[in-house]
Amino acid sequence: MKRIVSLLLALSVFAMVAGADNKPVTFEQLPDAAKTFITSNFKGVKILFASMDDDLIRPDYEVRLADGTEIDFDNDGRLEKIEMKSGAVPSGIVPVQVKDYVKANYQDVLIREYEVGLRHYEVKLSNGLELKFNKSFQLIGIDD
């Protein structure tokens, strides 16, 4: 009996997760912080697509720009991740401590991705390396 209840519970959770999907949204439907971020850092770049991932807990947003940039925001419009297809992540986005570390240790390398985690920051460089920093901006990991 416990197995049947467990199986039904698992199937119910799976069905709810599978039902959560991306829904197209307009620029105006994005959280205010996300709109400000986009207009401040990508003035004049066309938004190709914006969507809301309506998951079980809190929705989040994904925006794709005409230059190939992909940006993820949380429910409140705070940046979660930015990925550049060409060029570097705009300089005002990455914390100065992270930028200084990259500049001092990796000359002629661009920051292509920047991700904000609960306890860390992560950047992916144009040379393929991924650097992970704690919230005190100390390097805690390198992955290639």
Predicted segments with their positions:
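Short amphipathic alpha-helical "recognition" segments used for binding
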Residues: 6-7, 103
